[in-house]
């Protein structure tokens, strides 16, 4: 817990540490055929970086902060069931949906060109 960053990607904010992997619903900047294994990614939307006891916050993002990582694989999340029923009409509809997600690993966090 000595260093971590809070990033914004895929419509959500994540607390990321180097060497750990995370699931994200979708990368806006990548097309589906670019989501292959070991594709290197750079995330520039870094909201905050903590290194030991110092905290640097952006407004809204930190300038010169980059989170480098690579894609491990694409996967599907757990299936949810949608059930619609209209009473007194004998109308029932049951649907399922699985959200596509991408698993990536964070390799390093950079601030102003230096790895923290």
UniProtKB/Swiss-Prot annotation:
SUPFAM superfamilies listed in its UniProt record: L21p-like
GO biological process: translation
Keyword Ribosomal protein: yes
Record-linked PROSITE patterns: RIBOSOMAL_L21
Keyword Aminoacyl-tRNA synthetase in record: no
Single GO MF descriptor: rRNA binding
Main location: plastid
Matches recorded under InterPro entries: bL21-like, bL21-like_sf, Ribosomal_bL21, Ribosomal_bL21_CS
Highest taxon of source: Eukaryota
Entry keyword set: Chloroplast, Plastid, Ribonucleoprotein, Ribosomal protein, RNA-binding, rRNA-binding
GO cellular component: chloroplast; ribonucleoprotein complex; ribosome
Cellular localization per UniProt: Plastid, Chloroplast
Subunit structure: Part of the 50S ribosomal subunit.
Protein family according to the UniProt entry: Belongs to the bacterial ribosomal protein bL21 family.
Functional summary from the UniProt entry: This protein binds to 23S rRNA.
The name this protein goes by in its record: Large ribosomal subunit protein bL21c
Organism, as annotated: Marchantia polymorpha
């Amino acid at each position: 817990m000595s260093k971590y960053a809070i990033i914004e990607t895929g419509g959500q904010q994540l607390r990321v540490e180097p060497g750990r992997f995370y699931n994200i619903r979708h990368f806006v900047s990548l097309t589906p055929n670019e989501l292959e294994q070991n594709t290197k990614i750079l995330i520039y939307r870094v909201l905050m970086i903590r290194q030991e006891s110092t905290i640097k916050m952006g407004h809204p993002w930190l300038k010169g902060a980059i989170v480098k990582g690579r894609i491990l694989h694409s996967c599907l999340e757990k299936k949810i069931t949608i059930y619609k029923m209209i009473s007194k009409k004998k109308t029932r509809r049951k649907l399922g949906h699985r959200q596509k997600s991408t698993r990536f690993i964070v390799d390093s966090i950079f601030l102003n060109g230096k790895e923290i």
